[in-house]
Curated annotation (Swiss-Prot):
It is found in: Secreted. GO terms for cellular component: extracellular region. It comes from Protobothrops flavoviridis. Residues 1-19 form the signal peptide. InterPro entries: PSP94 (IPR008735). Belongs to the beta-microseminoprotein family. Keywords: Disulfide bond, Secreted, Signal. This is Small serum protein 4. Its main location: secreted. Disulfide bonds join C21-C74, C41-C66, C64-C73. Shows an slight inhibitory effect toward the metalloproteinase brevilysin H6, but does not inhibit the metalloproteinases thermolysin, HR1A and HR1B.
């Protein structure tokens, strides 16, 4: 039972260490007193603009996605065998 419990804890630790994601939630924009929907995201890695529902990879191994709720980037890992 002790070994099973240790394996469960190890698997949770491994799962949480595999992903490193960051997100940026855009500030609301106003135009004529009305909220303007988000049209683009600005990549904080290279300062380029990307359209909503687009995906791209950065030079420092992040896979990014621009969504209506903001920009989200996750670190890509290369498995060494």
């Amino acid at each position: 039972m002790k070994v099973f419990f240790i394996l469960i804890i190890f698997s949770f630790t491994l799962a949480t260490c595999q992903g490193h994601c960051i997100g940026s939630i855009p500030l609301p924009e106003m135009e004529d007193g009305e909220d303007v929907p988000l049209r683009t995201c600005v990549d904080t890695h290279d300062e380029k603009k990307h359209l909503i529902v687009s995906t791209w990879k950065t030079a420092n191994s992040f896979s990014c996605e621009c969504r209506q709720d903001g920009m989200w980037c996750c670190k890509e890992y290369v498995a060494v065998a």
